[in-house]
Each structure stands twice: as C-alpha cells, then as structure tokens.
C-alpha cells in the first residue's frame, strides 16, 4: 500500500509541474536582428546643418524587415515601415531632404516590397492652470490654457550624442529658448527590440520583436501657473487605405503595473476590415519621478480621436509620404482629479507608449503566478484523490483480514 501511495503522489506531482512547465514554455519566440545607423547614406562632402539628423533602426527577420526612422528636424517623429524583403534599405536624397524635405527624398527600397507604413508625430505640448483640480481639460475654462509649445520650433539635441548601438536606443531632448525651458527639457527615448520582453521600470509594457517603445518625459520645465498640468498632443500618419480607432482592454492582473488594470490600444486597420496591421499601445498611467515608487504614479487619459487636415510639420513625414495620407490626432493629459500634487511639486512627468506592427502584445500571467495558481488549484484535488484512495484501500484491507469461521 505504501509503495502504491508514493507512486500515485509522484504521478500527480508530475502532472502538476508538467502543466506548469507547459505554460512556462509558451511565449513569443520570434526574433529579429537589430542594427542602428546614423544618417544612412550621408557621405562627404555633404554635411548636415545643426538640428537635422536621422537614426535608422533596422529589425531583420527571417523573411522581412522592419524599419524605424527617428528624425529631429521639425516636430519629432518616429516612422515605421514594414518590407517583405530582407534586402530592403532606407535611402535618402540628402540634398533634397536638407533643402526642402521634398516628397520622395526618403524611401524604403525596393518600394514594391513595402506592405505597411505609419508614423507617430509629437506636435504640441499644452499647459493649463487646473484651478478646479478636475484633471480634465474638457472641463477647464478656455482662459486657463497657456499658449502651446510648438515642438517643431524646439531646439533638439544632436542624435549622435545619445545613440546607444548595443542597447538599440536613442534619446532626443529639446526645448524652447524661453525662461520656462531654461533648466528643463522634453525628451523622447526610442528603443527597438530583438525579442519579447519587458523593461524593469514601470509601466513595464510587454514588447516583442515587432514593436518599438517611446518613453516621453518632461523634466525641470518651469510651470506658468501654480496648478499647472500638461497635455501631450500627437498625431498618427498612415496611408489613406487605413482607418484608426482606440480600444480599451481590461485585465485581471496588475503584477507588472501595480493598480493598473487597463490598457489603451490605438490600432490601424484597412478600410472595411477589422484586421489590425499596426498599433500604438499604452497604459493609463504616468509617473512623477524618474525612479518612481507606488505613490509617484498618476493617471493619464486620452481624448477622442479626431481626423486632422494637413501634413504635420515634420521633415521625415513630408519626405516619406508621397501619396494620399490619413491623419488622426489624439491628446494625452496627465493628472488625477482632486490630487493635491501638481506638476510643480516634482517638475517631472513621464509616459510610455509602444508602436509596432500587427496585433498589440497581450499581457499574460508571469511564470511565478502560473505556478502558484496551478499548485493552488491542483493541491486540494490531490488530497481529495489521496483521501479517497486511502479510504478504499483501508476498507479492502479490513475486509480481507476479518475473521472467517472454519467449516
């Protein structure tokens, strides 16, 4: 009986940990080989004027290529182009690009290999005096808004000083020549990934090899009011054959982003189709310190999606998109209603968004949580089965050893 029970326990444990191992083995194993290039194709005697530069981040797959291009000329923008060729390349007609950013001066060749293109452009930074502490720009009086900061007029840092080849990241910082930005800046950090993973820093968005990450922060900017809050305005540019919508998904797990159970997804689909070709994804949370603790988190909300007429004032957008485009605009506002902590308290706010190809990554439980759930569900079942087996064996043993009269 003892050997039977031991064998049964071992079998059940193998089932439990086999199931857990099956869960742990799942995941996105797709990888890309990422390379980073500054000002592709630029050669002497050509040189760039101050404040003009391109960074090309290339993700090479087994049978396709994903191109990301960051430009600091005009309003900062990140361009995404997918090609079904492993030999595709970014080519720039530098004289045309420098002089007028004329349409077609930046291309991905062969052009016939391009299947999808989109871009995110950061156009304005708004500031308003939230005297009623609603953290809702829609409820703020028009007179409480200050003139917006036009990001196309910012003086941006040189890209070659912040390019990290090994980490596949680049940081772009800029500001106005005004008192507000005398000791402050608005910065964007772009990261491109070889495989699935997460940043250690909150909000720890799940990324994959088809996505890039933009982290935006405002640091040290002197507010123009005692109760100032900021709004980031940005636009999505894509081909005319695509339409956009913003979806909100809920989750039962806040393991990676404490107290946040929702994720917003700005997705792009072909007209008259629900299939997703591209996305921007973020969680409705921002942070008031560079190294935040739980208390440094604050809410952020997005406005309604609106259709925008006119090309954004960005050199890379004007240089790449040669055909009809469809442009949408969205605002992200920061702050929580009735929160006594305004921007002036820390003079810092950060927000993170993913931009990528295909369906947005979807959060799932971590390996630790899966093991805990599996063991928690199966352990009671093990004891029930063992109890039943023990009772049955004990009963049979009692019957077989009972006194039987001799005929």
From Swiss-Prot:
**Which parts of the chain does the record assign to the membrane side Cytoplasmic?**
390-407
Instruction: Please give the name of this protein.
Output: Glycosylated lysosomal membrane protein
Function noted in UniProt: Required to protect lysosomal transporter MFSD1 from lysosomal proteolysis and for MFSD1 lysosomal localization.
Question: Coding gene?
Answer: glmp
Q: Give an example GO biological process.
A: protein stabilization
Keywords from the UniProt entry: Glycoprotein, Lysosome, Membrane, Signal, Transmembrane, Transmembrane helix
Q: Which InterPro entries match?
A: NCU-G1
Which stretches are transmembrane? 369-389
Q: How does it assemble?
A: Interacts (via lumenal domain) with lysosomal protein MFSD1; the interaction starts while both proteins are still in the endoplasmic reticulum and is required for stabilization of MFSD1 in lysosomes but has no direct effect on its targeting to lysosomes or transporter activity.
Matching entries from PANTHER family are given as: GLYCOSYLATED LYSOSOMAL MEMBRANE PROTEIN (PTHR31981:SF1)
Q: Which residues are glycosylated?
A: 63, 84, 99, 132, 160, 164, 183, 210, 226, 272, 331
Q: How does it sit in the membrane?
A: Single-pass type I membrane protein
Family annotation (Pfam families): NCU-G1
Q: Report if keyword Transmembrane is assigned.
A: yes
């Amino acid at each position: 009986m003892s050997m039977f029970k031991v064998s049964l326990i071992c079998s059940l444990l193998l089932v439990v940990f086999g199931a857990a191992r099956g869960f742990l083995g799942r995941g996105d194993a797709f990888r890309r080989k990422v390379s980073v290039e500054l000002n592709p194709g630029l050669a002497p005697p050509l040189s760039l004027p101050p404040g003009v530069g391109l960074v090309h981040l290339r993700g090479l797959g087994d049978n396709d290529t994903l191109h990301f291009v960051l430009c600091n000329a005009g309003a900062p923008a990140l361009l995404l182009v997918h090609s079904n060729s492993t030999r595709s390349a970014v080519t720039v007609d530098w004289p045309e690009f420098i002089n007028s950013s004329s349409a077609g001066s930046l291309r991905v060749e062969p052009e016939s290999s391009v299947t999808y293109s989109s871009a995110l452009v950061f156009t304005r930074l708004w500031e308003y005096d939230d005297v009623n502490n609603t953290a809702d720009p829609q409820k703020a009086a028009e007179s409480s808004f200050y003139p917006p900061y036009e990001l196309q007029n910012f003086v941006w840092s040189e890209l070659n000083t912040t390019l990290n080849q090994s980490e596949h990241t680049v940081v772009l910082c800029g500001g106005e020549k005004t008192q507000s930005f005398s000791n402050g800046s608005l910065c964007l950090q772009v990261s491109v990934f070889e495989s699935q993973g997460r940043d250690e820093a909150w909000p720890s968005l799940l990324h994959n090899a088809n996505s890039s990450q933009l982290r935006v922060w405002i640091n040290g900017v002197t507010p123009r009011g005692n109760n100032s809050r900021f709004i980031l305005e940005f636009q999505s540019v894509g081909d005319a054959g695509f339409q956009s919508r913003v979806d909100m998904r809920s989750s039962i797990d806040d393991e990676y982003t404490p107290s946040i159970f929702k994720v917003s997804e700005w997705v792009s689909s072909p007209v008259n189709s629900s299939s997703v070709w591209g996305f921007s994804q973020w969680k409705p949370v921002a942070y008031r310190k560079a190294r935040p603790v739980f208390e440094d988190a604050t809410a952020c909300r997005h406005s309604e999606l609106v259709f925008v007429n006119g090309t954004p004032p960005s050199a890379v957008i004007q240089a790449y998109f040669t055909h009809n485009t469809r442009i949408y605009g969205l605002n992200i506002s920061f702050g929580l209603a009735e929160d006594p902590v305004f921007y002036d308290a820390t003079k810092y706010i950060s927000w993170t968004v993913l931009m990528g190809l295909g369906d947005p990554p979807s959060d799932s439980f971590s390996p630790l949580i899966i093991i805990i759930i599996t063991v928690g569900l199966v352990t009671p079942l093990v004891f029930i089965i063992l109890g039943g087996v023990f009772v049955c064996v004990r009963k049979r043993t009692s019957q077989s050893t009972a006194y039987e009269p001799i005929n």
